[in-house]
Amino acid sequence: TYHGANRLGANSLLSASVDGWFTLPFTIPNYLADHLNEDKLAEDSAEAQEAVQKSQERIDKLMQVHGDDPHGPSHYHRQLGDLLYFGCGVSRNVEDLKDTIEKIRALRDDFWKNVRIPGEANDMNQVLEYGLRVADYLDLGELMCIDALDRDESCGAHFREDHLSEEGEAERDDENWCFVSAWEPGENKNEFIRHAEPLYLSLIHI
């Protein structure tokens, strides 16, 4: 997304999806035009082989799960949706966010112990594809809650109950939080590193 889920909220996510349909045809060709004379990355290059290996290891890990309490990917998808709906909706608070983060981590641990993927990895396997997506959703759901907990203000669709004006309206803190958050995984488990890109609103006139 071009803004993230915790300031402008769902509108930005929808805008990013819709805008892509008419911006990508003009931006991607222009980018590729500057690389027409470059050699293609060989299939046996170190970069390509590393990417293939990482993908294969992830698939193998998922297919090799044989837990004592098996469930399909949809079981975990539904539970994650409920957790985010009640713990990281438009109205958020510190206690619920912390609790939701812990519950998502527990759900992810159970996913990697008990998720059941029928069929074979080398066949057309839609359940495998779904399982890989749910694995991503679990990581993304945790990060959304971490970002909502980290953003110590109220703004737009990010409504923190501990940051309200006397009239009960959202209380922004542009002095400290007027930036886009971009996160990357850290080296340790459950660790994320935030990068901040400042927002400049001087050209906006209301």
Task: Please describe what each predicted stretch is.
Residues T1-I204:
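Glycine- and aromatic-enriched mobile tails/lids
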